[in-house]
Swiss-Prot record:
GO terms for cellular component: cytosol
Residues bound to substrate: 13, 51, 70, 80-81, 163, 196, 214-215, 224-225
Location in the cell: Cytoplasm
Source organism superkingdom: Bacteria
Example GO biological process: lysine biosynthetic process via diaminopimelate
Residues marked Important for dimerization (site): 273
Single annotated GO MF: diaminopimelate epimerase activity
Pathway: Amino-acid biosynthesis; L-lysine biosynthesis via DAP pathway; DL-2,6-diaminopimelate from LL-2,6-diaminopimelate: step 1/1
Keywords of the record: Amino-acid biosynthesis, Cytoplasm, Isomerase, Lysine biosynthesis
UniProt source species: Alcanivorax borkumensis (strain ATCC 700651 / DSM 11573 / NCIMB 13689 / SK2)
Family the entry assigns: Belongs to the diaminopimelate epimerase family.
Reactions the enzyme catalyzes: (2S,6S)-2,6-diaminopimelate = meso-2,6-diaminopimelate
Name of the protein in its database record: Diaminopimelate epimerase
EC number: 5.1.1.7
Amino acid sequence: MNLRFTKMHGLGNDFMVIDGIRQSLPETGLPLPADEIRRLADRKFGVGFDQMLIVQPAQGDADFRYRILNADGSEVSQCGNGARCFARFVREQGLTDKKSIRVETAAGQMTLSVTDDDQITVDMGAPRWAPDAIPMTAKAEADNYFLVSGTQAWDVGAVGLGNPHCTLLVENVDTAPVDTVGPLLESHEQFPERANVGFMQIVSRNEIRLRVYERGAGETLACGSGACAAVVIGQRRDWLDDTVTVHLPGGTLHVCYDGQGGIQMTGPASHVYDGAIEIAL
């Protein structure tokens, strides 16, 4: 099968975006076999991407269905940077001309809003603090948790945003142990579905620096849901105000949350190229 796709990125968090409305994909299980996704994600032998995004017809009253597949072939429920690229893709491809787009995800419905300066705001929904909603194993909901591995322990905040997130405070993100601590906490036994791990440096009450080790992808240049998680965790511990600028290795996002409704995350989405590749189904 000749598969048409568009390569996009949100602050360097890159995606292979596939129109599953105007071209046929398998109807059962994953939109593509996991081994085929891993091959396509390979940066030397495939297209190369952090996540694959699939545009599908909505099953309910939304405009589209939005599916996200990690580079390892696993499916996840949420990706903020991907959501911004999704909004730009469906408009550029002529699938809609709406500036407010409702999409179905495995975590529920979300709204994507395109501004006049082509920035895109994503309503990421309300944070979920209860351990079973993150999900993580803990006796009770808390502002922070101590995760132990061997002789080491880390003080983290944890929240569910469709995906499980934990965030720890560091003095300097440039020297943070992302490559070593990231995998340990991602697969920590208290996260039954694994977790995205954020390393947050606070610059001021309205500004942070952040690096994120994503489950199923490793460290990425940006993580929209990770930025939202870091902000609300910082707010919960009275470190941050309602509106926060988040500097990631790939660029800057703006996150707003006043404790009511959903977290609002704003940033760009970039179109890199269109292509086609032969795949075996």
